[in-house]
Swiss-Prot record:
EC number: 6.1.1.12
Biased composition (Basic and acidic residues): 8-32
Any one of the GO CC terms: cytosol
Protein name: Aspartate--tRNA ligase, cytoplasmic
GO molecular function ontology, one term from the record: RNA binding
Gene that this polypeptide is encoded by: dars-1
The organism of origin for this protein: Caenorhabditis elegans
Subcellular location, principal: cytoplasm
């Protein structure tokens, strides 16, 4: 074969050509990668803020890091010019050009965070911060700056934070099931609804709130409601402790319905059945028989009532108390009324900001009460109702509408939202209620009302074993299931009385809320078992 002419390129096989093509493509990619790395390095070099923003990633306790955080509520003009760390949720974000503004929320408190592009705040940092989804939790290192004009959209109106560093602690999904601003908005009045104004802002309905309760609980109003509710429990405990009461813990799984009725949840209990307690009633009394003299308990109670109303739930928190007395059950009734009025005063003195916050979204007349509390006898209440057009029998129980109407009449006549109704008909009270000594139609029992709705039911209890058996039989209570309760009165028991208060109902009525579910963290009713 003749040699190739001088200067001519040797012919390559198809295999060799493909190999060269692959090498060229590989070299091209390597060049692109190198160029990209150089470009990224250049961008990093340009980003003067690269170490001052980003995400912590998953905080799984891999290191102990100490940062001294300042609470949002503590940010004020007295701290102006100080550099501080603050942790909170991103409530709102707005950015334009070289500026970015956040509202940082921590509980019920909010503060504005401002960022301006400069030699320390890069364009990349502004872009990153403005892209953080609402409700994400962030750490901000910033200088507290006094502002010339009040920031009306925040609780901290006289200051803002000039951010230097921003790090994401926990990211929220970008699409929220409801907006905090919408959930915080006051519901329109009837007049506003009737006007059919265009461009009305969205208002979140109750079911949507409860379906997405975790988000709804973040609103300032929800925080205020449950701070007040915690205050009710705290004051109830403190007032009774000072008066010599002992807190007890009563069982919630019991052998027989505690109220002697049918509205109970029956549960399997090994080879038999048990019930969820409708109240701690029997065990409060047994504690009195055990010479505790004055007791109280706070805990859940259960009612299997198929009532889908604004004031009923199947599970709620009971504030219950029981007390031995010397000669007359009014010793106890008046004590309970005094405890409640003392509690109302404490709430109005110590929770003014929270009461105002709730009132902004759910306007209501301030709660009124008098001292000493008004005590109205049942026959007198019946007379008052009849004088105002209500047809009702002497021994009839009060329906919910009649209770409301009576509350309205009492408010007009006595200028109080709180009163005691004494001497209920015996036929409408539980089996353990002591009959009236002078008129067998009535009983030594009482209810207490707020804004025309019952918040406490109480009475003198039967402390004689034989009489208790007689009344239990009358109410068709299975004696075998309450034998230990009956036996506790065979060995001598002081006369005693007490009552049970519904925590959520007191919260609702004190604040003038329209539905008890707003005063329950995760409410339970016949139609709701989740979340």
């Amino acid at each position: 074969m003749a040699d190739a002419a001088e200067g001519e390129q040797p012919k390559l096989s198809k295999k060799e050509l493909n190999k060269l093509a692959r090498k060229a493509k590989k070299d091209e990619k390597a060049g692109e990668k190198g160029g990209n790395q150089q470009q990224a390095a250049a961008m990093d070099q340009e980003d003067a803020s690269k170490d001052f923003y980003g995400s912590y990633g998953l905080v799984n306790s891999k290191e102990k890091k100490v940062l001294n955080f300042l609470k949002v509520k503590e940010i004020n003009v007295s701290n102006a010019t100080k550099d501080v760390w603050v942790r909170g949720r991103i409530h709102t974000t707005r950015s334009k050009g070289k500026n970015c503004f956040l509202v940082l929320r921590q509980g019920v408190y909010t503060v504005q965070v401002a960022m301006f592009m400069n030699e320390k705040i890069s364009k990349q940092m502004l872009k990153f911060v403005s892209s953080i989804s609402k409700e994400s939790i962030v750490d901000v290192y910033a200088t507290i700056n006094k502002v010339d004009n009040p920031i009306e959209s925040c609780t901290q109106k006289d200051v803002e934070l000039l951010a230097q560093q921003v790090f994401v602690v926990s990211t929220s999904a970008p699409k929220l099931p409801l907006q905090i601003e919408d959930a915080s908005r006051r519901a329109p009045t009837d007049e506003e609804k009737a006007s059919e104004q265009e461009n009305q802002l969205a208002v979140v309905n109750l079911d949507t709130r409860l379906d997405n309760r975790v988000i709804d609980l973040r609103t300032p109003t929800s925080h205020a409601i449950f701070r007040i509710q915690a205050g009710i429990c705290n004051q109830f405990r403190n007032i009774l402790d000072v008066r010599g009461f002992v807190e007890i813990m009563a069982p919630k799984i019991i052998s027989a319905p505690s109220e002697g009725g049918a509205n109970v949840f029956e549960v399997s209990y090994f080879k038999g059945s048990a019930y969820l307690a409708q109240s701690p009633q029997l065990y409060k009394q047994m504690a009195i028989a055990g010479d505790f003299e004055k007791v109280y308990t706070i805990g859940p109670v259960f009612r299997a009532e198929d009532s889908n109303t604004h004031r009923h739930m199947t599970e709620f928190v009971g504030l219950d108390l029981e007390m031995a007395f010397n000669f007359h059950y009014h010793e106890v009734m008046e004590t309970i009324a005094e405890v409640l009025t003392q509690m109302f005063k404490g709430l109005q003195q110590n929770y003014q900001d929270e009461i105002a916050a709730v009132g902004n979204q759910y306007p209501a007349e301030p709660f009124q009460f008098c001292e000493p509390p008004l005590i109205l006898k049942y026959p007198d209440a019946i007379t008052l109702l009849r004088e105002n057009g209500i047809e009702i029998g002497d021994e009839d129980d009060l329906s919910t509408p009649v209770e409301k109407f009576l509350g309205k009449l009492v408010k007009e006549k006595y200028s109080t939202d709180f009163y005691v109704l004494d001497k209920f008909p015996l036929s409408v009270r539980p089996f353990y209620t002591m009959p009236d000594a002078h008129d067998e139609r009535y009983s030594n029992s009482y209810d207490m009302f707020m804004r025309g709705e019952e918040i406490l039911s109480g009475a003198q209890r039967i402390h004689d074993a034989d009489m208790l058996v007689e009344r239990a039989k009358h109410h068709q209570v299975d004696l075998a299931k309450i034998q230990s309760y009956i036996d506790s009165f065979k060995y001598g028991c002081p006369p005693h009385a007490g009552g049970g208060i519904g925590l959520e109902r007191v919260t609702m009525l004190f604040l003038g809320l329209h539905n008890i579910r707003l005063a329950s963290l995760f409410p339970r009713d016949p139609k709701r078992l989740t979340p």
